[in-house]
From Swiss-Prot:
<feature type="binding site">
    <location>
        <begin position="33"/>
        <end position="40"/>
    </location>
    <ligand>
        <name>GTP</name>
    </ligand>
</feature>
<dbReference type="InterPro" id="IPR031157">
    <property type="entry name" value="G_TR_CS"/>
</dbReference>
<comment type="subunit">
    <text>Heterodimer composed of CysD, the smaller subunit, and CysN.</text>
</comment>
<dbReference type="Pfam" id="PF22594">
    <property type="entry name" value="GTP-eEF1A_C"/>
</dbReference>
<dbReference type="InterPro" id="IPR041757">
    <property type="entry name" value="CysN_GTP-bd"/>
</dbReference>
<feature type="region of interest" description="G3">
    <location>
        <begin position="112"/>
        <end position="115"/>
    </location>
</feature>
<dbReference type="InterPro" id="IPR054696">
    <property type="entry name" value="GTP-eEF1A_C"/>
</dbReference>
<keyword id="KW-0547">Nucleotide-binding</keyword>
<feature type="domain" description="tr-type G">
    <location>
        <begin position="24"/>
        <end position="240"/>
    </location>
</feature>
<dbReference type="GO" id="GO:0004781">
    <property type="term" value="F:sulfate adenylyltransferase (ATP) activity"/>
</dbReference>
<keyword id="KW-0808">Transferase</keyword>
<dbReference type="InterPro" id="IPR000795">
    <property type="entry name" value="T_Tr_GTP-bd_dom"/>
</dbReference>
<dbReference type="GO" id="GO:0000103">
    <property type="term" value="P:sulfate assimilation"/>
</dbReference>
<feature type="region of interest" description="G4">
    <location>
        <begin position="167"/>
        <end position="170"/>
    </location>
</feature>
<dbReference type="GO" id="GO:0070814">
    <property type="term" value="P:hydrogen sulfide biosynthetic process"/>
</dbReference>
<dbReference type="GO" id="GO:0005524">
    <property type="term" value="F:ATP binding"/>
</dbReference>
<feature type="region of interest" description="G5">
    <location>
        <begin position="206"/>
        <end position="208"/>
    </location>
</feature>
């Protein structure tokens, strides 16, 4: 057992500790930045200095530090996070590593994301569920291309709180002038993100030495702000949750017996109360909320982020993938929209090819009609392209085979975000964030002359029998 938990148990007792722990707010944050900026070391330092490491974990780190560590005689705290063998041997982060810890104020889930450009898709995956981005900058190198790249992606994915940590201050002799120079450079860049709602905190620290991570440092006496952990403890994310209209994607129809039929899911945005009138989409049928059921008992209301089961006063047809909204909602139904797309596979995104598209709990079929531009996310410049490559980000027109109720991503991430799934391999090949919705009168459906079966058969033949020189049917009839 780690010492922080032991101390709290001794003070409160097991039941009081568990009750207090249950109702703490949860903050999800990711660490990102350029290669070797010290992301994994920072997380290791956070865990170590907040007394969240078990004795056997610390012993293992000491042993591994002698073999593959990069910090000399001291334990390499980055090894607490870099779990893959390839990561330890190369001294880099490849996959997204998740760690959990808590303080007396808050619970945390950390996503340690890779800094290398070829793992940008991993970083986007880690950022998609986070409230805060901790962006590390090496005090010696300043703002680099990958710093801009990760800031752009975090902003694109709806993260509204940035904590910019200028790391390795010990290597620039804790220079205040160097810190101010980097701070000015980053704030100038952040204006190009065109997001007036961004909350940016910038602070100096040394993850290796532990300066200003959990505790204030005499070496940084000129810095009058809070250490990193206090900043994270005090970030206000409750205001973000309460915004927006009620959205409830149905994940599961719960029918344990003939007397109960409920619809389980997580409230994506807004709130709902017993007695509120709702509309089930796409059917458009109305009813009122009879009960809000949880494992701990019924609630009178539920807010964004809560997993609940709703029962209705009327028996109406609702299934997995349907969406519940309030009756006065102005949610738009469409089969065409513009979206920023992050491409995640070696084979580039090609307009005209069909993919399975999953939005919240709903699965449908769609295609890219056109690529407006790709973004150079190092300079934020836009340029024309015929296809999106691996790790490419661009604005595209997307068409669906059916009408779906959607939001813009900035209004609701769950009903405004989606993934592309390759129909042959079932591999997730891309992720999208809806920017603009088209009116149904303006929308153009996918070519009705081609069935989904014909598209898949044609793709299989072209993949496995290339010597037949079969043409792409979707392009021939598009």
């Amino acid at each position: 057992m780690n010492s922080a938990v032991e101390q709290q148990l001794a003070e409160l007792g097991i039941e009081a500790y568990l009750k207090e722990h249950q109702y703490k707010s949860l903050l999800r944050f990711l660490t990102c930045g350029s290669v070797d900026d010290g992301k994994s070391t920072l997380i290791g330092r956070l865990l170590h200095d907040s007394k969240q490491i078990y004795a056997d974990q610390l012993d293992a780190v000491h042993a591994d530090s002698q073999r593959v560590g990069t910090t000399g005689e001291r334990p390499d705290l980055a090894l607490l996070v870099d779990g893959l063998q390839a990561e330890r041997e190369q001294g880099i982060t490849i996959d997204v590593a998740y760690r959990y810890f808590s303080t007396q104020k808050r619970k945390f889930i950390i996503a340690d994301t890779p800094g290398h450009e070829q793992y940008t898709r991993n970083m986007a995956t880690g950022a998609s569920t986070c409230n805060v981005a901790v962006i590390l900058i090496d005090a010696r190198k300043g703002v680099l291309d990958q710093t801009r790249r990760h800031s752009y992606i975090a902003n694109l994915l709806g993260i509204r709180h940035f904590v910019v940590a200028v790391n390795k201050m010990d290597l620039v002799e804790y220079s205040q002038s160097r810190f101010e120079e980097i701070k000015e450079e980053y704030l100038a860049f952040s204006k190009k993100l065109n997001n007036p709602n961004l909350d940016i905190s910038i602070l100096p620290l040394s993850a290796l030495e532990g300066d200003n991570v959990v505790n204030p440092s005499d070496a940084l006496s000129w810095y009058q702000g809070e250490p990193l952990l206090e900043v994270l403890e005090n970030v206000d994310i409750d205001a973000d949750k309460g915004n927006g209209e009620f959205r409830f994607p149905v994940q599961y129809v719960n029918r344990p017996n003939l007397d109960f039929r409920g619809f389980a899911g997580t409230v994506s945005s807004g709130g709902i109360s017993v007695g509120d009138e709702i509309v089930a989409l796409p059917s458009g049928k109305k009813s009122k909320v009879a009960r809000i059921v949880t494992f701990d008992g019924d609630l009178t209301s539920a807010q964004a982020g809560q997993a609940v089961t709703l029962t209705l006063e009327d028996e109406i047809d609702i299934s997995r993938g349907d969406l519940l909204v309030k009756s006065q909602s102005n949610l738009q139904a469409t089969d065409q929209f513009k979206a920023e797309i992050v491409w995640m596979t070696e084979k580039g995104l090609e307009p005209g090819r069909q993919y399975d598209i999953k939005i919240a709990g709903k699965k449908t079929v769609g295609q890219i009609d056109a690529i407006h531009h790709q973004v150079n996310i190092n300079s934020l410049e836009k340029f024309d392209t015929q296809e999106l490559p691996l790790n490419g980000i661009g604005l595209c027109d997307v068409s669906l085979t059916e009408t779906v109720s959607l939001d813009r991503y900035q209004d609701c991430a769950d009903t405004g975000g989606f993934i592309f799934i390759d129909r042959l391999t079932n591999v997730t090949v891309g992720a999208g964030m809806i920017q603009n919705l088209s009116d149904l009168s303006e929308s153009k459906p996918i070519n009705d002359n081609i069935s989904a079966f014909e598209i898949e058969l044609n793709a299989l033949i072209r993949k496995h029998f290339p010597h037949w020189e079969t043409k792409d049917i979707s392009k021939l009839l598009g």
